[in-house]
């Protein structure tokens, strides 16, 4: 039995497939989901989404931003404002993006601007986590 996973950003579905396991960071901690898991609704945090499939030795990795997860009858739907597939991570641009986001965070005078810069830093750190994982393979 497999889990049907669908990931959507505003306006479109960015990834859809079947997997054997999903690991995701929620606001209450990391959770692992296997087939026949009890139904849940959870708020997810910006982090690395890891999925495993029997068809591949390597996990499927992507960065997702804050959003929501719904699981019912082995069907997972993740709605997020941003999703970065592993193949779309530009390693050469990450350092520049990190410096820019850190500068914006440090110079932010309003809480809203600090929050947005912090989200960018979390996304960039998650990208680095994926690159680090792949470099250690």
From Swiss-Prot:
Keyword match Transport: yes
> Can you provide one Gene Ontology molecular function annotated for this UniProt record?
proton-transporting ATP synthase activity, rotational mechanism
Its principal location? Answer: plastid
What are the UniProt keywords, alphabetically?
ATP synthesis, CF(1), Chloroplast, Hydrogen ion transport, Ion transport, Membrane, Plastid, Thylakoid, Transport
Cellular compartments annotated: Plastid, Chloroplast thylakoid membrane
User: How is the protein disposed in the membrane?
Assistant: Peripheral membrane protein
Q: What Pfam families does this protein's entry cite?
A: ATP-synt_DE_N (PF02823)
Q: Does the keyword Ion transport apply?
A: yes
Q: CDD domains per the record?
A: F1-ATPase_delta
Q: Cellular component GO terms, alphabetically?
A: chloroplast thylakoid membrane; proton-transporting ATP synthase complex
| UniProt-listed Gene3D superfamilies | F0F1 ATP synthase delta/epsilon subunit, N-terminal
The record describes the protein's role as:
Produces ATP from ADP in the presence of a proton gradient across the membrane.
Report the sequence similarity comment from the record: Belongs to the ATPase epsilon chain family.
Summary of subunit composition and partner proteins: F-type ATPases have 2 components, CF(1) - the catalytic core - and CF(0) - the membrane proton channel. CF(1) has five subunits: alpha(3), beta(3), gamma(1), delta(1), epsilon(1). CF(0) has three main subunits: a, b and c.
Name of this chain's protein: ATP synthase epsilon chain, chloroplastic
What gene does the UniProt entry assign to this protein?
atpE
